[in-house]
Amino acid sequence: MRPTGRLHLGHFFGALANWLKLQQEYDCYFFVADWHALTTHYEDTSSIAENTLQVAMDWLAVGLDPQKSTLFVQSQILEHAELHVLLSMITPLSWLERVPTYKEQIENLKGRDLGTYGFLGYPLLQSADIVMYGEPKQDLLVPVGEDQAPHVELTREIVRAFNFAFGFSVKIPNDIDTRNLIREQLPETDVAPPKTPPLVQQAFDDHLRRDFREAARKAMTEWGYENFREKMGANAKFFTLTSVLQEPAYIPTETPRLPGLDGRRMAKSYGNAIWLTDPPDEIRTKTRNMLTDPQRVRRTDPGRPEICPVFAYHKLFSPPETVVRIDRDCRSAAIGCVDCKKEMAENLVKWIEPIQARRKQFEANPQQVWDILDTGSKQAHKVARKTMKRVRNAIFQWDEARQSSNPARAGKVATGE
């Protein structure tokens, strides 16, 4: 989540409510994405630190538990930037340009200088953020809304390309039957005939290896490794793919409809938000001016709760029996919009009271919040270091090089950590 400052009800129901459930079931990593904030607002960084504190306070106030989840700040884990750079080496520009939100944000943020790699490449940084905390052969799950699903799909493609580039190896078989099978499945490749002289055999093998790598790269990027192995059948025995990075899967996040005060999506830029920190009287004032059913002009006109933003709030903050009554009385014009808003506002105030009470405790001791973020950053750093050691070795083969240059030390590992 970007450090935009205090959070509003849209943040809670759009993300935080789901996070509270996930932390009960999974090892969760939640971070303040301060680097991502630079992709669209690099010209003014003066508020990032304070906004980071405000976001973290709201996280803790709604119930994110540092004993159950790892809470940290993105820029404190430098490995995110390193992995971002390494992923950029194998990611075509066209993959980034086709991300749906790329053109949408350009349209929505007119007037800003968005002609930077930071803006174009932010989905790639997002991919690094995701896969940093994955372990090969273990589920890596990302909770996202429908609009963010393409980002996870992009990450899956990038991981496939990366694993192929640095984890794929081919060993050309010597037996004639397997070579003939390769010829049948890949007729465009050159498979050396029997009794070929060694040097010619090597040339054929090199050519076959190149052809097969390219065909395999395209297939694995499209299908995924396991599906590729299944389709290759018997030929799967002469190649291996080491999963350096784990492909993520996304958990669809179902978010209840919570419009802003004017009926549009709740957003800071629209000025239509109710903040988690709004005092009770401010909540009452804001909700008093909420948009309602535009066809209900007079008090005696029947209403349509299904299109009324106020009723959407009732469904989230009022008791079930109240929701049933409001639905009935609105349709029959037994209750007017003014009274309906008042009742909803009081229920909203009751719902938000414990959140604000917890937040006041953290406001009185902001150092506690920084300490929680620092502790979380240290925990995240341990995982990131492990991931990057695996990544660096896959790309540069540092461990093998050191051991081969000093046979006496092979199999012995010393560390100053």
Residue locations for each model-derived region?
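Conserved nucleotide- and phosphate/pyrophosphate-binding catalytic cores
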Residues: 11, 150, 158-417
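N-terminal Rossmann-like or analogous alpha/beta NTP/dinucleotide-binding catalytic cores
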Residues: 3-130, 159, 350, 356, ...
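Conserved aromatic-histidine-acidic binding/catalytic patches
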Residues: 4-7, 43-44, 112, 140-146, ...
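Short, histidine-centered active-site or binding-site loop motifs used for metal coordination
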Residues: 1-3, 34-36, 136-137, 270
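Active-site-proximal beta-alpha loop/turn segments in soluble metabolic enzymes
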Residues: 40-41, 136, 265-266
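Classical nucleotidyltransferase
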Residues: 82-85, 94, 100-107, 111-193, ...
